[in-house]
């Protein structure tokens, strides 16, 4: 198992945890002195009280929690949010409220998932043409909405 260094910037912060044995993402919790209300149609930056040190060649992705998305229309507008291996600041989560009702975030609420994944940097090779494929330049919606 990969070891990732983590610092509690606030002693009240909760460490990320896997909710189940085979979970891909760890639940990330809010670390707040007072509740934050995310008004309908707005976004708020939520502190976690944590900083991490990822190994070179890895990133952490912050993703919405499916239950918050389904029940409250709460998501992350920059999902997946990327935490680079060289970032050492506090992990914060942008929550956006797509719903009609204000959404209150309290200390300890699980607000996002964190997935740690390998990444590879690339170097681009500029060419005049690209190889042909069956798909070609077919873009958004090119396969239609029909049944499987």
UniProtKB/Swiss-Prot annotation:
The keyword Cell membrane does not apply. Its cofactor is Mg(2+). Pfam families: dUTPase. Its EC number is 3.6.1.23. GO terms for molecular function: dUTP diphosphatase activity; magnesium ion binding. Transmembrane segments: none annotated. Pathway: Pyrimidine metabolism; dUMP biosynthesis; dUMP from dCTP (dUTP route): step 2/2. It catalyses: dUTP + H2O = dUMP + diphosphate + H(+). It comes from the Bacteria. One of its GO terms (biological process) is dUTP catabolic process. Substrate binds at residues 65-67, 78, 82-84, 92. Keywords: Hydrolase, Magnesium, Metal-binding, Nucleotide metabolism. CDD domains: trimeric_dUTPase. PANTHER family: DEOXYURIDINE 5'-TRIPHOSPHATE NUCLEOTIDOHYDROLASE. Belongs to the dUTPase family. This enzyme is involved in nucleotide metabolism: it produces dUMP, the immediate precursor of thymidine nucleotides and it decreases the intracellular concentration of dUTP so that uracil cannot be incorporated into DNA. This is Deoxyuridine 5'-triphosphate nucleotidohydrolase. It comes from Chlorobium luteolum (strain DSM 273 / BCRC 81028 / 2530). The lineage of its organism: Bacteria, Pseudomonadati, Chlorobiota, Chlorobiia, Chlorobiales.
């Amino acid at each position: 198992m990969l070891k990732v260094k983590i610092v509690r910037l606030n002693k009240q912060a909760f460490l990320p945890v896997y909710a189940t044995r085979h979970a891909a993402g760890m639940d990330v919790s809010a670390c707040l002195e007072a509740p934050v209300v995310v008004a309908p149609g707005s976004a708020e930056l939520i502190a976690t009280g944590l900083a991490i040190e990822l190994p070179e060649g890895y990133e952490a992705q912050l993703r919405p929690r499916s239950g918050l998305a389904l029940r409250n229309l709460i998501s992350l507008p920059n999902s997946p949010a990327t935490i680079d291996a060289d970032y050492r600041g506090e992990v914060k989560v942008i929550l956006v409220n797509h719903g009609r009702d204000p959404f209150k975030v309290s200390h300890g609420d699980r607000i996002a998932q964190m997935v740690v994944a390998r990444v590879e940097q690339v170097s681009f090779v500029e060419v005049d043409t690209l190889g042909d494929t069956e798909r070609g330049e077919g873009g958004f919606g090119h396969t239609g909405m029909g049944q499987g």
